[in-house]
Amino acid sequence: MSSPWYTWTCCGINLFGRGNHAYKRLGDPLEGCPERWRQEIDLGLPPGVCLGDVVQSNLGTTALHQTYLLAVQSNKITDYLKRFDVAKIPAGCQETVKTQVKKLQSIQNVVWNTMLALAVGEITVDDSALQSLLNKRAGECVSLMEMEKLATAMASDDSVIWASEISHSLSEPTSVLPLTPAVTRQPEATLPKPPTEDPSVSAMHSSIPPRPSSTLEETTESAIGST
């Protein structure tokens, strides 16, 4: 089909090129999706999956809302998993932490599979069925509750590096009492001890017999008569 006459000049070439049809933008299936939904779905998807993969089929508002709710739970589980670094956990608690981490990862895998199945249109989840799945949401999951208890126990352990600062701040006194002035006491006067008698002297005194009284009287009378 020949081009319109205005696309050619007298020299046979249009300096501005041939006229093109106006570009018509394709419709965005997520035009009615709130920005919060977009962000949660982007964060809640499994590694290697983007939002475009989820909405490759024109999802309805109901499916998008269900995908958003599942993404919120996936993000909560991811946040809990980031809190636990096995290198900073005491050796006695590492096995328990590993068990709980495996439980959380299995729950997250179920959430991811449900999101992808909704995206490709393989399944249609009823609201009541989705609610039964969301009843084990991240905030009330048994595994997460056990993890919270374990985190509290580890925080009270002074041997943990990242808990030492918390325990130090809790051990500091909140108020300082005024110091009372010290009372000085005068030393009490002590009497000198009596000198101890030599045991040989005391034995000598005890060996001298007492003088009889009759001899003393005779001596007195003889002295008077001589005078």
Curated annotation (Swiss-Prot):
Protein modification: Phosphorylated.
Principal subcellular localization: virion
Entry keyword set: Host cytoplasm, Host Golgi apparatus, Lipoprotein, Palmitate, Phosphoprotein, Virion, Virion tegument
Subcellular location: Virion tegument; Host cytoplasm; Host Golgi apparatus
Lipid attachment in record (S-palmitoyl cysteine): C11
GO CC annotation terms, alphabetical: host cell Golgi apparatus; viral tegument
Keyword set includes Isomerase: no
Region (Disordered): 183-227
Record's compositionally biased regions (Polar residues): 213-227
InterPro entries, alphabetized: Herpes_U44 (IPR007619)
Phosphoprotein listed as a keyword: yes
The protein's assembly and partners: Oligomerizes. Interacts with ORF42; this interaction mediates ORF42 incorporation to virions. Interacts with vBCL2.
Family per similarity comment: Belongs to the herpesviridae UL51 family.
Protein purpose: Plays several roles during the time course of infection, including egress of virus particles from the perinuclear space and secondary envelopment of cytoplasmic capsids that bud into specific trans-Golgi network (TGN)-derived membranes.
Record-given protein name: Tegument protein ORF55
Taxonomic source organism: Human herpesvirus 8 type P (isolate GK18)
Record lineage: Viruses, Duplodnaviria, Heunggongvirae, Peploviricota, Herviviricetes
